[in-house]
Amino acid sequence: MKTLFDKTNLGTINMKNRFLRGALWTALADEKGHMTNELSDVYEELARGGVGTIVTGYAFVTENEQPNPRMMGIYDDSFIPEYKEFTDKIHRLGSNIIMQIVYGGFMTEFNVGERVIWGPSTTKNEVTGTLSREMTKEDIKYLVNAYAEAALRVKKSGFDGVEIHGGHGYLVSQFLSPYYNKRTDEYGGSIENRGRFVFEIFKAIREKVGEKFPILIKLNSSDYVKEGGLTIEDSLYVAERLAELGIDAIEVTGGNESIEEVMKDNLGPSRTKVAISKDRESYFKEYAIKLAERTNKPVILSGGNRHFDVMEELLNDTNIEYFSLSRPLTAEPDLINKWYSGDLKKPKCKSCNQCYKTYGKRCIFNIK
């Protein structure tokens, strides 16, 4: 019988347990995206709390496109020394750390003004109103290279891997979704074409970082829109193609935060009312189960993971190997240590999402 505290290997990463802290923007970097003591403290507390691997909040890959205020940056080499010092601290505390990288596209809300915001097509974010301009092929080439250069900096900074953000309405998922991608060239239309952007990003990163450095993707299972969005079958195609290309792991997510209908129907990535009953937990599990059956790459399940026994049952009854938690570890950074000690109570997190409204994205029940 497999357990959630098995020691395993994810690519070249030695995992002390099957738990990851999923990416969460904390808004604690400085205005240019550089590390602060406050931000480092958040990750150090998580590492002391026992989680095997931490994925950072997303880091932006080009200086002129910071999607949200005080998010981490990785757009030039000035970040490498401070991140090397940071990753050394996390490793000394016993955790691995992976950096998630992103280009926001029309998910950008910060200092938009007259800036040109790129997207697969000229379109508008239904939730924020941010407009994007259709990218030229030269723009696409530039961004593919920006992702690759950022990933190389991630490696030089001592991170254990890099994760491409391919969900929630950010640029990669905009390309994947026919809801927003209306292109008529080789980057639009069929799922083979809509996937071309992320396939090129992956191949460019692999060429920069080498064969052994772990590359992951956080991939939308579906937009969960009634009509015209990314479907589960299309997403499975993208995941399988990335597996063929050599991706090291796929973190499953879903929901498009830029589509008003999705957010209104509570079908985004951070759903509320998860704590009502066990059958509302792990809400992307059906897709993750299918994906784990169709690829030999490790599948990481995110989204509403709460009860220890539910996750352990999924571990043993399916091919899902790892479990990502964000909001529960915001409420209880030492949750994994509690579980390891035998205290298997469900997390205190109520999935109310009020943490997203606080300074530093802190649980409102912990603020004194």
Predicted regions and their residues:
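Flavin-dependent oxidoreductase catalytic cores
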Residues: M1-K368
